[in-house]
Amino acid sequence: MRAPGIAAGPLYNPVISIGNRFGDPSMNHPVRQLASDNYSGICPEALDYLLAANQGDASAYGNDDWTQRAADRFRDLFETDCEVFFVFNGTAANSLSLAALCQSYHSVICHETAHIETDECGGPEFASNGSKLLLAKGERGKLDPVEVERLITRRSDIHYPKPKVVSITQATELGTVYMLDELEALRELADQYKLKIHMDGARFANALVTLNETPARLTWQAGVDVLCLGGTKNGMAVGEAILFFDRELATDFAYRCKQAGQLASKMRFIAAPWLGLLETGAWLRNARHANEMAAYLAQRLRAIPGLQPLFPCQANSVFLELPSPVIQALRAEGWQFYTFIGVGGVRLMCSWNTTREAIDQFISDLERMLA
């Protein structure tokens, strides 16, 4: 049963009649944005399961059927008996999982544009009581194994934070994806030096549909030890899943979640929307649609003389350089987008509910301002 005022459909628009119901018409004002998949509302499948989970009472702190079913569904999809945890957001997922892999005197090797370095306010260092992030270079947002090995072998004395983890962002902060052979090369390097592999998969579903591989093939079969899987950016209101493919690494992890304020008492309201995404296949449909819209946006941009995306469009974002007056003019028209992500330029992000009409309107406004 759907909530009143919510329309069904593959491109369900979350801007519903809430404002009228609560006496504030301004809440109906649509946002003109290609800023972030975090701006988007809840997709119908996640919302349906959330409402279903709200029928009656259920045990607290994850001891409910919804949480068990969602965890089991992850195990089926990833074809392994992994440990599954649910937390509220990606910063907590990354920070707590990295803390589980490290002691305070260890270090984590990540790309210089990785979210754990640029956008988590020191969360990984805080959760681990001081594990240091070592920054590696690499083209298009991806780790270069040569650079990773340089950081591993640069020093081995007692004064240097001992490398313990390689963190991979899939898809990357620049909208590119690691190919299977690139993942395997990093795993081979990690094995050589006895390091663990952490994957920040806030947009893992976008990479998955691009590569047309199985979830297992792109994670534990490629050597990933822990995956932080994003739901918030893919149609959920809140909630990420942490999958430990090496179950021993999850020892006492529930205590970390509780201590960090990440043990949801009504966990079914995180788990049920996840189940909705997974059981209906919406997690892949949503990601595929977002990717297709980004590809369409990149195509329209390339048709404008003098404009060229900065990186290959392999997931759901497009980066490009625009003159400052054009950026200001677009914002004056009400368009919202980011200019502080990655290596600069404008980031345009598509989501599960981005429409061609919105992209066409953006292109029309952009062409007018460039004229």
Language model feature labels by segment:
Residues 8-26:
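Short, Lys/Arg-enriched N-terminal segments with co-localized hydrophobic residues
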